[in-house]
């Protein structure tokens, strides 16, 4: 039956294709995996490239996906230690208010991160056996996440069309300089700037500083290393931005329920919340605990997949606060049980977050602001109390706060009373639930489901060998042509010459009139 279903999908879409995937770890992989599972269900052959140092991309997965593992000089433990070190530093050691220190910390992280992925990429593209196998496989499309550089180089080496699945790149630099998207700093907040769509003058100043930081540091320093590396591998001068700009389609994991209005291009599509789905029944014991809450309902608490534990002191403060709530609390927590854990709070190493948020008795969601969790809360219409830690989490919760669906607290400075008051407000003030439901209705009222949209455009690229007709001419222009500096210069030159000629003619006429007048006087 499954085979017949897959064959029917193949016939309806034209043909079954071969998809090569270059993934990113953590929540990025969870989103990518959702797309890949759907492609497999439609009969496509999906091959995922993973290094031997991969953290979450599991080669033992039995979902019908083929995994091609290549050896690398890094180890899984080293990669995990790298991410955990910087996660802890960016979460606990640096304040966003200290801009210069914050910039420097991100700069060091980006440089080390880039070095790690350059080494992994080198281990792949210089592996003749693996590359020969990939060439022979004749893939129809390369699906990649640009936050993990190398997919664009791989697509160029294999001469295959490239499709991106992306949440964001730092400062929107790739989207702007390679994808051609517009991000006017006057009204579009730069990602990681912690700003919303309505900015005061000083917030626009801050937004401009963030944009300049990413434009000049990230663009001028970090990418130049990849320019050299890609040129060496391809044997010809090329820029990394040029390779990124060859992406046929950008599947952006966002939507207007989270974003503020901004310009898009014909080859850019929002597919935010593609992993969201109707709630499924909970495990028996968990359902019993949820039902025991009565009319008060439950609160769901999760800080995502990357935060596995907290300090004992912080865990105890949180536990004592949660114990004061009349609601039952389901807390995703992997650490020592807090000494003052309330009877209303249950700890779990893993929770079916989507199913809990979709439960009829769920009242609020305590979240770190990761895009996956925020979209699940939007999907089910659940208001949030946000504790952002790093990256885009501050932005996501700033947007939700501006839209009236969340209260955001500072993880480092919040007191127990701040936390408790925020929870009581979100649960008891009906405006937060109303705003969350408004966003939920917006999310559901789309002409095509996000996952279906992602699948459609990947299959579209396979059917048509690309999507060149959607590519704006800006990609073929130099920077001075893009900004019409040559046209402005030409028009200024014409104006200058015309002005000069007019003045010259006027002076000649004036002199002739003057000379004629003098001659008449002499006569």
Swiss-Prot record:
Cellular compartment(s): Microsome membrane; Endoplasmic reticulum membrane
Its job: UDPGT is of major importance in the conjugation and subsequent elimination of potentially toxic xenobiotics and endogenous compounds. Acts on small phenolic agents such as 2-beta-naphthol and 4-methylumbelliferone as well as bulky phenolic compounds like 2-hydroxy- and 4-hydroxybiphenyl. In contrast to 2B13 it is active toward 4-hydroxyesterone.
Sequence intervals crossing the membrane: 487-503
Family to which the UniProt record says this protein belongs: Belongs to the UDP-glycosyltransferase family.
Gene that specifies this protein: UGT2B16
Keywords: Endoplasmic reticulum, Glycoprotein, Glycosyltransferase, Membrane, Microsome, Signal, Transferase, Transmembrane, Transmembrane helix
Name of the protein this chain belongs to: UDP-glucuronosyltransferase 2B16
InterPro entries found in the cross-reference section: UDP-glycosyltransferase (IPR050271), UDP_glucos_trans (IPR002213), UDP_glycos_trans_CS (IPR035595)
One of the record's GO cellular component terms: endoplasmic reticulum membrane
Record's signal peptide: 1-16
Enzyme Commission designation: 2.4.1.17
PROSITE patterns according to UniProt: UDPGT (PS00375)
Source organism, top-level taxon: Eukaryota
Membrane topology: Single-pass membrane protein
Gene Ontology terms for molecular function: glucuronosyltransferase activity
Principal EC category: transferase
Annotated Pfam families: UDPGT
Residues carrying a glycan: 309
Annotated positions of the N6-succinyllysine modification: 129
Reaction equations catalysed: glucuronate acceptor + UDP-alpha-D-glucuronate = acceptor beta-D-glucuronoside + UDP + H(+)
Organism (species): Oryctolagus cuniculus (Rabbit)
